[in-house]
Structures are given as C-alpha cells and as structure tokens.
Amino acid sequence: MEEGDEPRPSTATFVRNHATAIVACDFMVAVTAKFQMLYVFLIVELGSRRILHCNVTAHPAAEWTLQQFREGLSDERDYRFVIHDRDSIFSAELDQELRQGFGLRVLLTPPQSPKANAFCERLVGTIRRECLDFMILLNESHLRGILREWVQHYNSGRPHSSLGPGIPDDAHKDRAAQRGTSWQSIAAKRQVISRPILGGLHHEYAWKAA
C-alpha cells in the first residue's frame, strides 16, 4: 500500500456495513426414506437473517435456480450483492442474469471455502439440527411442507441471539415495544399461550388477554 492510500476494509467490516443489501444463497441435500436425493435451495438476507426463499427440487438446474430468485427477491428491497459458491449450477449465464435482471453484484466465494458463505452454512446446520434430523422424509412434497412450516417459525417465532435477541420478520419487531413495560404488569392482564410447531418439535409462545 502506497503512502496516502486508504486501507481496504476487512470482509467482516464490508458485510457489517452492507448487511441489509446483501443476500446469500446455497443448496443443501436431504435424503428421503427411499434414499432419493433432494436439493433444498435457500436465500437469506444477511442483515435480518430472514429466509427470503426456500424451495425443493430433485433436479437442480440453472433455470430452476434463476426462477427461485424471481420468486424470492422482492422489488420493494434494494439488494445490491449476492453471495454464492462456485457450484456448476451457478453458471455464467445465471450470474449475468443476476447482474442485468436483478442489478446484483455477484460475490463468488473462493474455491473449497464454505466458511466464506458462513451465513448460509450456519443456516444449513440450523435446519439440520432443529428440523430435519428429527424427520423421516417421504418425498419432495413432504419435505417442502416441513420446510414451509419451519421457515415460518424461523422467521417469525424463533429468537436469534445475533439480533439482540430478536426475530427476523419486521412484523414481529413491535415486540420490542414491550421491553419498557414490566413483566408483572403484562402478566397481570394476559396469559401465555403455546402453539406447537411441526407436531410439537418446537413451540412458540405469545401473550393472550386474560
């Protein structure tokens, strides 16, 4: 670095400064009871940790993957970057469409460096530990239904320590308003109700007027 040049920010600093404008995506593999290989595609927003899209296919391809971006990325949000690995599914044509059609700058991870897509890698591990490790998958439709319910729970009912702890969905941010109110005053007027998730594998709790 020459004298007078500004030092380049670290990757961690870049991600922290642009988190709400970055999405990351990845595939994970799930195996059914009949040993059929299914592929789960995930898109996550780094800033909120919210899962923007999740879908399943037995035959992943570039065109199918591009369609998932069309379904998962809202026009209301101005995303600028997408992180993905060097899987052959992410073809040059797909990346070109992400640049031209979505206005995204593609950030490729280095070869054989899963930690460079750490947000997705952690999400994949969470899905396995909290959901799929407890399930016997029957087929593609069954897996899709399980993930649909779990993603809803992950986004709207599961606290994340990295968020404060908080919950990814904007619709649930109003819970923060209750922090200034004492627990005793809330409990005197309401009762706690429980809602089972995935047949009782997890539960969500909420206040209900007494």
Where are these regions (language model features)?
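Charged DNA-binding/catalytic regions of mobile-element recombinases
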Residues: 1-210
